[in-house]
Amino acid sequence: YLQGAHSNRFKAPTLVRAIFSSGLFAEGWAVYTEKMMADAGFGGPEVHMQQLKMRLRVIINSIIDHKIHTKGMTEQEAMAMMMNEGYQEDGEAAGKWRRACLTSTQLSTYYVGSAEVEGIKAAWETKNKPNLLKMNDEILSFGTPSPKCIKRSMGL
C-alpha cells in the first residue's frame, strides 16, 4: 500500500512513465519490505518464521517459472516441488501452475525484483551511511519504474 501511495503522488516526466509501471519493482518492493520488517523484529519470531516460509515460496516460484518455460517442467514436477519443497497447499500450487502457464516470468518478478531492490540497498549503503528511512523514501520517490531506472536515478 505504501509503495502504491507514493507511486500515485509521483509526477511522471513523460506520458510513458505515467502509464506504465514496473511489476518487477512493485512485487520486489513488497518482498523486500516484508523481509525488512521481519529483520527488524516486527511481530516476533512467529512473523520471522512466516516471512522465511514466504521467501522460500518466492524462490521456488521463480525456479518453476523458469523451468516451465525453458526446461519443459511438467505439471506433476512443478506441483511436487511447490508442495514438497515449498510447503504450499495443493490449491495454491495448482493456481501457481496455471499462472505460470499463462504468463511467462510473472512468478519470477517477486524474487528477481526483491534481489534488485536489495542490490539498490547495497549500492546505496556503499555511498552513504546506513539509514533505511532516508534510503527507502528516496527509492519510493521515483514512482514505480524498473529497479534499473531507480538505481540510475539515485546515481548508483
Language-model features: locations:
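N-terminal maturation segment of proteins
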Residues: Y1-L156
